[in-house]
């Protein structure tokens, strides 16, 4: 019975401490809010500052969006990938270029196929 009472006292103490800690956290948050939005600055000035910050953020986002759109429009439209005949001989009908990371070369099977193929550029 004595141990049950001791455990109940300990549980009550822990619960009270927890609620007291939550109250301190709430007070701390209120103090931070007050310090962040000082009352000595008039409302009009704080609204103007907020408006300027939002306009700057909007301009930055619009600039990023324009750059993304330029990148989308400037990408390669049609090109040939790896191991596709690129046909750079004058008599060939297919004249599409290889993609940027490939080059048109005579591969090991050139003697048989008589065609060039797009292969990866060597990075060395």
Swiss-Prot record:
Disulfide bonds join 79-99, 86-104, 98-118. Keywords: Cleavage on pair of basic residues, Disulfide bond, Ion channel impairing toxin, Knottin, Secreted, Signal, Toxin. The keyword Disulfide bond applies. Its main location: secreted. One of its GO terms (cellular component) is extracellular region. It is found in: Secreted. InterPro entries: Toxin_22. Residues 21-78 form a propeptide. Expressed by the venom gland. Pfam families: Toxin_22. Residues 1-20 form the signal peptide. One of its GO terms (molecular function) is sodium channel inhibitor activity. Ion channel inhibitor. Belongs to the neurotoxin 14 (magi-1) family. 04 (ICK-6) subfamily. The presence of a 'disulfide through disulfide knot' structurally defines this protein as a knottin. This is U12-barytoxin-Tl1a. It comes from Trittame loki. The lineage of its organism: Eukaryota, Metazoa, Ecdysozoa, Arthropoda, Chelicerata.
